[in-house]
Amino acid sequence: MDPKRPTFPSPPGVIRAPWQQSTEDQSQLLDQPSLGRARGLIMPIDEPLPGRGRAFSVPGEMPVRFGRGITQSIAAEPLVGMARGVRLPMEEGGFGRGRGFLLPTPEPTVGIGRGAAIGPVPTLDIQKAEVEEKMPELQAEVAPTVAKVGSPGTGSSLVSMFRGLGIEPGKTWGRGAAPVGRGAAGDMGADLQPKPTIIGASLTPEREEVRSEESISFLGRGFTGFGRAAMPHMTVGRGPIGPLSPSPSVAAPFSLISASSASEDAPVAPGTPPKVEVKIETVKEPLQKIGTKGSPIPIGSNYIPICCKNDAVFQYHVTFTPNVESLSMRFGMMKEHRPTTGEVVAFDGSILYLPKRLEEVVHLKAERKTDNQEIDIKIQLTKILPPSSDLCIPFYNVVLRRVMKILGLKLVGRNHYDPNAVVILGKHRLQVWPGYSTSIKHTDGGLYLVVDVSHKVLRNDSVLDVMNLIYQGSRESFQDECTKEFVGSIVITRYNNRTYRIDDIEWSKSPKDTFTLADGSVTTFVDYYRKNYGITIKELDQPLLIHRPKERSRPGGKVITGEILLLPELSFMTGIPEKMRKDFRAMKDLTMHINVGAQQHTQSLKQLLHNINSNNEALSELGRWGLSISQEILVTQGRTLPSETICLHSASFVTSPAVDWSRELVRDPSISTVPLNCWAVFYPRRATDQAEELVTTFSRVAGPMGMRVERPIRVELRDDRTETFVKSIHSQLTSEPRVQLVVCIMTGNRDDLYSAIKKLCCIQSPVPSQAINVRTISQPQKLRSVAQKILLQINCKLGGELWTVNVPLKYLMVIGVDVHHDTSKKSRSVMGFVASLNSMLTKWYSRVTFQMPNEEIINGFRVCLLAALQKYYEVNHAFPEKIVIYRDGVSDGQLKTVEHYEIPQILKCFETIPNYEPKLAFIVVQKRISTTLYSYGSDHFGTPSPGTVLDHTVTNRDWVDFYLMAHSIRQGCGLPTHYITVYNTANLTPDHLQRLTFKMCHLYWNWPGTIRVPAPCKYAHKLAFLSGQYLHSEPAIQLSEKLFFL
């Protein structure tokens, strides 16, 4: 009972109905009719029974507490409360509302819907003996469809529902248990009511006084037991129910006790085994996420259907008495009882999963080896899971890893590779290991094996070999150069195929040093590798590499901390060398083996499936859990979204199938351009010719694009040192404050010079800047095309607008958010925030915030959002009505955090603006996913066209999500982007969300085509990358309305 709710005592001389007392006193009388919530069929009954109506009558001026009717004095005969305020006198008996059907009864009986009113219905005159005679037949008909569930024990959640109501769990309360409707109402007369017997309840004098008063009132949605819940004396529903009105000689089915004693055990017959609560996991209803716009097409994916032959997986809780702390001891004790549990188990120390059902409670005995203590092991059934339950997925993946090992694949990191199929690139001293990344997922379409082709690039050179090369090149700064080269990189030790990240180099130690083993013995590194791996260490004076693993627990309770020391001679570099990334020919040779097309990709998948299904040992391992993997790749129906129209200043056109409009962009004027009247070019003396040629080309190509470019201020530098550039730029900006743009022509890829220029132009003296590598403008045949692209980028940085698409939503703000890690302080991260300022989505506002690991990202997000809203109001003289946020950098495990923490904080931001409640859609953008899509036709797999969307079968069961491939693929497979709608009050349907997202992928002005993510996300990424990689500080606020970071 709500303590804040006022009490209304009954008028003197009026007796309150016993079922009304149960509401006020939080207890129920023993011999009164039981109240249930059956939605079953209507059966004949022997006397009027109470239901629940939404209207009722009360005597005199007594305050109305229940229902929605009006107050009226009551005559001798009762009135029935009809639906929502309709009152009707009845001569005898009554009826309630029936939403279903009424079975034929000895006399016609009427069921009525909401709001209907009917005249009196005669009370059915059926003797109890007649009902009792019919009971066995009715039970026999119902029994086959009723599942038997034991009555709950003390700790049952079913019992807790009634705790505090004074009801002892002597019988199961099922949904359809009680033969009375949804509640009690009316007054049957004092002479008809059974005398209450209170067991274990203590009533205060005030309560006793209230009970002695007289009252007539109605509670519930009906009057008699006709309608939703009336039933005869029968056991229907999810548990056994005793008779409705037990005779005084029969024990009552329920004992009424006080709230303080509600948790006592129910009396059970001698010899009855204890009952435990077993939960059955329910199947979730699918979410409405499927769109209809676009052309249907067949789509293939790297999802392989998995069939579960078992009916269920059974979850047990294992208790050790006395307690056993060591996990390894627990595993050993459970292994001794495999004859009971079976050979197929999944056990984590306390939760046990089996594919077979044991008794509800099983007691086993074991002996602790350390002190010979006898341990009692209690295995109690707690939950019955469908075989596709999310709780089963982790140990299904363990089974899958065993299968991959059976096939001869080696686990490196999280993926499996085939060392027997290695590809040697001798010219580049590289090895490519082909392999697979695999996982089992439960999606909207069921249980699937997700397989992706993976490649591991290993170098033939060990870390020691690279150290020798560095020593030959720079002996003076040898250790510093080694630290720059190795710290942060990933190495593999081939004696165990494990990968490690190098965190530091220990120069003071060598393989001749000793270390302590797990058993306490001391040995040298040389002896350790000779005894355990048969490896002879050749270089005895090499330093050691340090790997600091993240603190984590291993099975057995052992916590891994400290450092792992590795030998450079046995550690091999992984990944593509930085020098090789800049070598076009070397990268072309490598990508031939890494970037496989759709047909080759699917062939690799089919080969793996064939290997699994043709290996008896692998099939046996899967069959232990009732799993079987199909040999066919999933093919389902997707859609291709309609093409978009690109709008320039005075021209518009529909995109081509390749979604590339670079020709139209340089042929027609942009939406708006900024005249380049005062700008400066800085270049070293040896790049004078290239600088002059570039300025001339700017003048030739600017006209057709709608730009006006004046002659720049030329500043020739005597050298290309960083100090020379910075001093010259600072001097020029000081002497000529009207400079709109700084262009720097640099020789080579120099991060230090680039960072210094950007810090000066983005923080100290805010002005848009353009850095150009001299190699980019050194080829005359490509100079015109390069100049056009640079001019378009410059126009964006100055505040110009290039193109847009038609977005029908007015007063819309689209926001992009991405997070990047600051390279100067590895623990610090930077968030880029970009928001649109106009309905055409061509004006953007950008901000940056830095935060430490223990600081929530939402703190800086709130500041950026309020600033963007204020700027939007300054531009439009109104706040946006709808806000769509695209949030990048969120993994599946962080979705609930975003939903329960970030979004409420965003909503609180809106409360700071009076009378402002915008509609919000929050969409998470995921690029690093394992899903691959293929076009399919004539038994041939290809690359999907841009605009391909898939919003069912492979989607997440818990969210409204879809996969969209917005960009054009020239080589490799179709890698879509996953969009998850975490929050949506903007009334945007799945079609709206998909089409808006596709439109936003057209608006990245650095590329005249579609990109993989929405443009605001890409802008936010570029801004966060610039700030975290080079600036290490927030850019000046003067640049916030320009895309200076492109």
UniProtKB/Swiss-Prot annotation:
So which cofactors does this thing need?
Mg(2+)
Task: Please name the CDD domains in this protein's record.
Answer: PAZ_piwi_like, Piwi_piwi-like_Euk
UniProt modification remark: Methylated on arginine residues; required for the interaction with Tudor domain-containing protein and subsequent localization to the meiotic nuage, also named P granule.
- Looking at the record, the residues that make up the Piwi domain are 741-1032
Q: Where in the cell is it found?
A: Cytoplasm; Nucleus
SUPFAM superfamilies this protein is in?
Answer: PAZ domain, Ribonuclease H-like
Major location, coarse class? Answer: cytoplasm
Q: Name one GO cellular component term.
A: nucleus
State the Gene Ontology BP annotations. gamete generation; germ-line stem cell population maintenance; meiotic cell cycle; negative regulation of SMAD protein signal transduction; oogenesis; piRNA processing; positive regulation of gene expression; regulation of translation
Membership in a protein family: Belongs to the argonaute family. Piwi subfamily.
Function comment: Endoribonuclease that plays a central role during spermatogenesis by repressing transposable elements and preventing their mobilization, which is essential for the germline integrity. Plays an essential role in germ cell differentiation and meiosis, independently of the function in transposable elements repression. Acts via the piRNA metabolic process, which mediates the repression of transposable elements during meiosis by forming complexes composed of piRNAs and Piwi proteins and govern the methylation and subsequent repression of transposons.
User: What is the protein's given name?
Assistant: Piwi-like protein 2
Q: Which gene encodes it?
A: piwil2
